[in-house]
């Protein structure tokens, strides 16, 4: 009887810990999504009210609102509705795969996928709401400008880097 009770309590503790972790993961994703939304709403309001073409932040960062109908860095920007809808559908499928990967992974890899999902949800929201993603961070050096991006893109990029680092670390330990 005592062993059965101990096992039952252990199972309850494990269930409670898993619930706490899942709640944390949910709020982690929600934080990324909200941070991205707030930054985009802020930049849209500035550019709508000021009609500025560019705001200089420093000698290497500008704010410059660009409506991106493609994917990362403006790639695959299509003017046709069919191609845009096809691309949006593919992105939603990829988001579903990332969600599944979060369930299946742990550690650094899980946090990489959580960051990717948070950023991807921010960008897919914009694609569905605005039919484009507002990009606004312009990093440059002299006449060389990197692709204009947003906060969601930062989290997606950091998440991918975490996955790469995790993969390299695992391969080096084998």
Residue ranges and their predicted role:
Residues 2-174:
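Alpha-helical transmembrane bundles and membrane-interface segments of multipass inner-membrane proteins
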